[in-house]
Amino acid sequence: MDAGRPEKEGLSPLGRFFFKEWRDIIVDGFIKRKESGLPGAHRIIPSHLALKASPGIKPENILWYEDMEQILRRSERISFMMCGCRGLWRKCDNPVDVCLQVQFPPENGEYKGEAHQYIKPPKDVSFDEALEVINRCENLGLVHIPLNTSHGDLICNCCDDCCMVINPMLNRGGGIIWEILTPSRYRAVVDQELCVGCGTCLKRCKFSAIETVDVPGSKKPKTRIINEHCLGCGVCVVKCTKKALTLELIRSPEHIPTISVMELMSRGRKT
């Protein structure tokens, strides 16, 4: 786990102070939420390219709100807006205008999504345009993170350098991120007979869930998944050219809360 990450470079003293304070405050809030027995505030949506590359997963077992392509198909309106984290910190070269907002039809006359206010209005896009952006994000190794509900309509495409959710957890260290960030219903699995030990997956994993081990008969160490650390994002699967990595389904549908966004947020305010 990459604890004690350096503060952002190029920021004013006030900016550095804010980022340090934020990293402490948000993680303390997440810990308090967990200790109160409440569901985590954020969850992982697996890469849809990784799901497609996993023949052991039957399409009928994939919930629509854990498949980026199905989420886009169900949306009445699709927009992208500037990532507040990456737009502010500019610590990496990943694209900035990739925070996804979708609008789902009301259920029984009730809108269960989230009301948003913007500094810069989002840009509406077509399904095909949105899917192209999502595919690009997945190939770059970004992780889909919405609020932890089936009705989360704002989905960030997160890096570990700038994200104001991932970065504070990684900075705190001690395995906090494995305890607080709600994993997807999936977990990576490796076929070591197909693995050639290229190390691409090791570099792409943001959650220290991959290590290399010596395997009898192999000149190179091969990939091993640390199961208790894997959050099921599928980032490692996407770039495995030998198809040695896939996802497996390990959790029930009840793992993802089906409450509204407002209910999830109001529960947090009661802690």
Task: Locate the predicted segments by residue.
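Flexible glycine/acidic-rich beta-alpha junction loops that bind and position SAM and/or redox cofactors
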Residues: M1, L88-R90, R251-P257
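Short, cationic-aromatic polyanion-contact patches
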Residues: M1-A3, G232-C233
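Short, amphipathic alpha-helical interaction segments positioned at domain boundaries
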Residues: D2-I25
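Catalytic cores of enzyme domains
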Residues: F30-P183, R187
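Ferredoxin-like iron-sulfur electron-transfer modules
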Residues: L142-H151, G175-R204, S208-G232, I250-E254
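Flanking helices and flexible, charged tails adjoining ferredoxin-like Fe-S electron-transfer domains
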Residues: K222-T271
